[in-house]
Amino acid sequence: MGRKFDLSVEAMLENLREVRSFIKSSGQTLGVDQEVLSDLCLIVDEAVTNVILHGYEGKDGAVDVQVTRDEDALVIYIREQAKTFSSSDVDTPHLETSLAEREYGGMGVYLIKN
């Protein structure tokens, strides 16, 4: 079994910085490439943001993040007790629309899947 790192935070947007810092420091300790680590920080930030905004909807709750590495695989678990949703219910964003014209949000699930 590889090394394991755990973090638990309250489901508040102001805790996203701590989550990103945790992913970065855990990844660095585990020898993850900096470019890959930057992508992982963005993806985990998007996932936790979705949990906070759409899962807990402002209610109290916790988000637990675990980072493990076993052989060649890095695994990140995000655990919560929020309301569930199906990612298949989320529309694919209009990528041809410029960032200036695009509505705020709506990219999280796309980034996570891709």
Residues of each region from the PLM?
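Conserved polar catalytic motif of the HATPase_c/GHKL fold
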Residues: 46-50
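Conserved beta-strand-loop-beta-strand hairpin that lines the nucleotide-binding pocket
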Residues: 1-6, 52-114
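Helix-loop-beta hinge of the Bergerat
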Residues: 2-34
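Conserved short strand/loop->alpha-helix "switch" segment adjacent to the catalytic nucleotide/phosphoryl-transfer site
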Residues: 23-45, 101-102
